[in-house]
Amino acid sequence: MGRPLNRRRADGLPGIVDIGCVAGEMEEEVARPLNFAVVETGVFRSGFPEAGNFSFLRSLRLRSVVYLCPEPYPEANLEFLEDNGIGLFQFGIEGHKEPFDNNIPEEMIREALKVVLDVRNHPLLIHCNRGKHRTGCVVGCLRKLQKWCLSSVFDEYQRFAAAKARVSDQRFMELFDVTSLKHLSPPFGLLKSSAVA
């Protein structure tokens, strides 16, 4: 006999759940992508989603995915998006291994933020390969727009990047100018989150 379908965590999102069919012959595991987290209502972040994450992503009822890598999106992921009516916004930001490499394309980050700030794209998932550096920079710049203090922006970034935190990413977030985005004041309560994380 299958286990319950509606197991929920304290944050209201599905946890890791086994879904069995009535005969118990086939089970599907519902798992979150690597480094998954809620950024704000309707905005999520993660590492690259795999097929084992599709059931979980389906439960989020995503409208859009913001993909931050230059590599082509895999066919299986494209099919998942198409089958579920999810739009794809790709910003080909190169990954960098060097901790002091400072080649983060500011204009691409700005364009990605415009997509994130547009409530018509919500619910939305922001992701790169591991959900650490490129995703961390986009979310960090969003936090600056929310008027978070820099120490809180850096704390959140470091929670995901851990030992791989990069000085160049933090410097980029510190220097990122949000004034050109202020006219796009987020209508979904993001500016109310000026609290320290």
Residue map of PLM features:
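Cys-dependent protein tyrosine phosphatase-like superfamily
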Residues: 1-126, 130, 137-197
